[in-house]
Amino acid sequence: MAPKKKKVAGLIKLQIQAGAANPAPPVGPALGQHGVNIMEFCKAYNAATESQRGNIVPVEITVYEDRSFSFITKTPPAAQLIKKAAGVAKGSGVPHTTKVGKITMDQVREIAETKKEDLNANDIDAAAKIIAGTARSMGIEVN
């Protein structure tokens, strides 16, 4: 007989600095209200994202009724990767009038390669278009 499936009690989505999860907000309160062992999650997340230090890594945590959990890490947000490539601290407040930086199409393709698994695109060209659109809406020129 197949083992019974665990019942899902909740789904938590967070964006945490890679390798730097700790019980302080926002991690602690989000997990605490679902009864998850916070330190256990922090240790597992930090171990899983150690290689990506310096990036913000989104994570989807599935909490089960027996208070156990599983999590899936995603690729860093496109906006974060674009800001790093353009060398700017933040996007423009008025993106269509004030440009804050420039990135090349090669950089856009590189970011698209990184993000491809999380994007809703069939090929790398479609993924590059999505990334270029995000860059433009941040006030960053794409050449």
Swiss-Prot record:
Q: Which InterPro entries match?
A: Ribosomal_uL11, Ribosomal_uL11_bac-typ, Ribosomal_uL11_C, Ribosomal_uL11_C_sf, Ribosomal_uL11_CS, Ribosomal_uL11_N, Ribosomal_uL11_N_sf
GO cellular component, alphabetical, reads: cytosolic large ribosomal subunit
Classification via Pfam families:
Ribosomal_L11, Ribosomal_L11_N
CDD domains in the record, alphabetically? Ribosomal_L11 (cd00349)
Tell me which UniProt keywords the record has, alphabetically: Methylation, Ribonucleoprotein, Ribosomal protein, RNA-binding, rRNA-binding
Which cysteines share a disulfide bond? none
The protein here is known as: Large ribosomal subunit protein uL11
Q: Which organism is it from?
A: Kocuria rhizophila (strain ATCC 9341 / DSM 348 / NBRC 103217 / DC2201)
Encoding gene, per UniProt annotation: rplK
